[in-house]
């Protein structure tokens, strides 16, 4: 049943998800979950996606430039062109490059550093992307996300 969870992922990815939960807690006062299960987000329309969908164990970026970018760029472009009032959260310098694929007149684009343990203290913590996303959605008459 669980579609998206951190179980089975390496420690680096668990720490990134923990940093995301920590920011949600700081931003919205939500309790930090005890599980990495993201099904509740998906059921509300959240689509968590990395630019590169696989990696060799313990080798960050090892599958970059192996073709994933073509696919994920097409997904981003299709969503941008085919929908309105989406929120794109682009975290990290590599993700920020994807802004060229997004119609910023139709969508909200939020950028900051990556939530990795190495960079989260340099702008991810305190970015308030989750409350900003909800404010934008509500301003468009769309139900906010229960993060």
PLM feature spans:
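Short, charged beta->alpha transition segments
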Residues: 12, 32-39
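C-terminal capping/extension of enzyme domains
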Residues: 15-17, 21-30, 53-84, 94-147
């Amino acid at each position: 049943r669980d579609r998206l969870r951190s179980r089975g992922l390496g420690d680096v990815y668990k720490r990134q998800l923990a940093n995301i939960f920590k920011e949600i807690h700081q931003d919205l006062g939500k309790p930090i979950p005890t599980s990495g299960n993201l099904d509740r987000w998906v059921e509300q329309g959240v689509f968590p996606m990395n630019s590169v969908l696989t990696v060799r164990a313990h080798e960050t970026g090892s599958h970059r430039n192996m073709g994933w970018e073509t696919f994920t760029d097409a997904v981003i472009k299709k969503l941008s062109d085919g929908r309105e009032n989406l929120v794109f959260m682009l975290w990290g310098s590599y993700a920020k490059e994807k802004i060229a694929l997004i119609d910023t007149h139709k969508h909200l684009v939020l950028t900051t550093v990556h939530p990795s343990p190495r960079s989260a203290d340099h702008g991810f913590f305190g970015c308030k992307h989750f409350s900003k996303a909800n404010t934008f959605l509500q301003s468009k008459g769309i139900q906010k996300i229960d993060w």
